[in-house]
Structures are given as C-alpha cells and as structure tokens.
C-alpha cells in the first residue's frame, strides 16, 4: 500500500508542477486555480496516510532522558502502564529490562499488546488502582477490553473513511486532469480549420468550386479579348 501511495504522490506532484507552469502564463484562470488547490489537498492527504502507516503495528519507544525509577523492577513483575494508543492506564507484565537505557519491554495483561517504555513511567499495581479510585470507579477487565475494542473499531472506521476520501479525490483529479488536457489540446487546434473549395463564398463575386489559393472571395482573373487571333488568321490569304 505504501509503495502505491508513493507512486500516486509522485504523480500528483508532477501534475501540480504542470498546472503551476500553466498558471505562470495564465495566472487568472479559474479552472487552473481550482485544480491547483485540489491537487495540493490530495497531496497533503496522501502524505498523512503515508505518515500514519508505519506507526501501525510497531512498538513505541520513549527514551530521551534516563530517569531513575522510583521502584526496583524485575522481569515478571506486574505494573500499571499507559497504553500509547489511547492514553489509558492498564495492568501489564514486565518481559525485559534494559538497565543501560532505563527502559522495559512490557505486555498488557489480557491484550497481548507489547510496548517499550521508560522504567520511571511504570507504576505499582496498588498505585494504579488507587489512582483509578481517585479518578472514579475502577474499571473491570471486561470493561477495559470493551473500551479497547471500541477504540480499535473507531480507528479502523476512521482509516476506511480516509481511504474513501482519497479514492474520491483520485477520481476527481483524474477527471479534472483529463478536462484540463482536452482544453489545452482544443486551444492549440483553434484557428486551424480548413475550408472546402466548394464552400459558399462570402462575397457576391466569389465562384463556387474554383480554387483560388485561399482568395475565393476575390473576383476571378480577367483576360483580354483574343477573338481576333482565331484560326482564320493563321490561314494563307
């Protein structure tokens, strides 16, 4: 999918360059200005899709500064951690610890989602439950799973909607680009219509069917009377 989007993005940029070149000659052309705006929008939408794709299915890493953890964690410990996708706190299990970078690889209990996050961001299970009680009624595992499913569903719907919008933009751009090319072709051909020699002349003196090399409306060439130079003139007297 990303390779296809890259090709389309390159094609949109090439079209935009041609439109901008045409605008440099005719800057007030409304059709060209509209086409330029539409191309810019579809380019931005395609870039957004390309940016969002690599983020899906990958683990998030947050490690800029190493901060001393408030608790001595060990592999297998259960903790409370914030899931990067929705910002909610869930119970997780520590799978691996990187003391050098001060990070831990964790897996959220009941979900199987794995992430890597700083050790100082982890909370003890008791602390997490106390915070839930302060914020409101603690959520059951079933409720948390339902929330996560709903979040994923909304995210998938949003992605499908964006893909539909992009497909519609592609079709619109395809149609507009064809119209633009047809107009340019018609403009180049303007004034090159050939007239038939049998076309009606525009003046009363013109003759139908007489080729005059593009001057059919001019009167026919006049010749002097040569009747005195007849055959008898050549015969001996």
UniProtKB/Swiss-Prot annotation:
Tudor domain boundaries: 72-132
Domain of life of the native organism: Eukaryota
Motif (Nuclear localization signal): 142-160
Coiled-coil intervals: none
Described function: Involved in spliceosome assembly.
Subunit structure: Associates with spliceosomes.
Protein name: Survival of motor neuron-related-splicing factor 30
């Amino acid at each position: 999918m990303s390779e296809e989007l890259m090709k389309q993005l390159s094609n949109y940029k090439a079209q935009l360059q041609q439109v901008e070149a045409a605008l440099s000659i005719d800057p007030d052309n409304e059709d060209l200005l509209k086409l330029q705006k539409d191309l810019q929008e579809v380019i931005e939408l395609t870039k957004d899709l390309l940016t969002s794709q690599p983020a899906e299915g990958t683990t998030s890493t947050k490690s800029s500064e190493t901060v001393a953890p408030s608790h001595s964690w060990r592999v297998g410990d259960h903790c409370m951690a914030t899931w990067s996708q929705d910002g909610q706190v869930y119970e997780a299990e520590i799978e691996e610890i990187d003391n050098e970078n001060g990070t831990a690889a964790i897996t959220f209990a009941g979900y199987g989602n794995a992430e890597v996050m700083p050790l100082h961001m982890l909370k003890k299970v008791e602390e997490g439950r106390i915070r839930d009680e302060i914020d409101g009624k603690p959520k059951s595992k079933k409720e948390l799973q339902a929330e996560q499913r709903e979040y994923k569903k909304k995210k998938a719907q949003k992605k499908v909607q964006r893909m539909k919008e992009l497909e519609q933009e592609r079709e619109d751009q395809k149609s507009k680009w064809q119209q633009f090319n047809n107009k340019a072709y018609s403009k180049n051909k303007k004034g090159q219509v050939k007239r038939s020699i049998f076309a009606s002349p525009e003046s009363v003196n013109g003759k139908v069917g007489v080729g005059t090399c593009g001057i059919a409306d001019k009167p026919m060439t006049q010749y002097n009377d040569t009747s005195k130079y007849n055959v008898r003139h050549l015969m001996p007297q």
